[in-house]
Regions:
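Active-site/acyl-donor-binding loops of N-acyltransferases
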Residues: 1-14, 18, 95, 144-205
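Short alpha-helical interface elements
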Residues: 40, 55, 76-90, 102, ...
Length: 205
């Protein structure tokens, strides 16, 4: 999914003003519920210190996903930060100095690519953490002058509720061995990418 950032937005307040009443109310409710969250970007040293917690929170979300084609290695986030440096950002959500959630971003020229995230299920329900993360990603994109936010193909309805639009993607795979292998490969890809019914939301005036 792709979220185009409007040129007239210079702050999250501009974004909020363009929302319809229903979705502006939803935004304010989420912000109010997440008010107690201490949010901050994690440095390389903090990522190293919190490595196990980051993986645990990521795994918590990953294990509850409907379909999961792979599992990241335990040092994945630390390794990516070491390689991409300032082009890879992790933002932690803390409650009473305990990490209860995080999201990560890849800065790719004019596009902000959302990456993996994680959260504690109890805190997610209490604080609407996932929705707050989506709004915080939007804030980061606006304040840092990105043109688009690129989202994964999961939780499409809630992402469309903040302004993201579905974007058709194509994949071409060919096995070099045989026709049978290609037929099996096609079935595997179809299984790993099930069609989900969802309702697109239109949050803007």
């Amino acid at each position: 999914m792709i979220f185009p950032i409007r040129q007239n937005w210079s702050s999250i307040n501009d974004y909020c003003l363009d929302l319809s009443k229903k979705y502006r109310r939803r935004y304010k409710t989420a912000i109010k519920k997440g008010y107690s969250i201490d949010r901050r970007e994690l440095s390389l040293n903090e990522i190293r210190e919190l490595n196990n917690e980051l993986f645990r929170l990521y795994k918590n979300v990953s294990d509850n996903a409907g379909v999961n084609s792979f599992i990241l290695s335990e040092n994945h986030f630390l390794s990516l930060k070491q390689h991409l440096k300032d082009d890879f950002r992790i933002f932690g959500y803390f409650k009473e100095d305990i990490l209860v959630g995080f999201y990560s971003l890849i800065l790719n020229h004019k596009s902000l690519e959302t990456y993996f995230l994680g959260y504690d299920q109890e805190s997610q329900r209490e604080l609407q953490m996932y929705l707050n993360m989506l709004y915080d990603m939007t804030r980061f994109a606006i304040e840092n002058k990105f043109e688009t936010v690129v989202y994964a193909r999961t939780a499409m309805e809630i992402k469309s509720s903040i302004g993201a639009k579905p974007n058709t993607m194509h994949i071409y795979l060919k096995h070099t061995n045989s026709l049978i292998a290609n037929t099996v490969l096609k079935l595997i890809v179809k299984y790993m990418n099930p069609i989900r019914e969802w309702e697109e939301r239109h949050p803007f005036k």
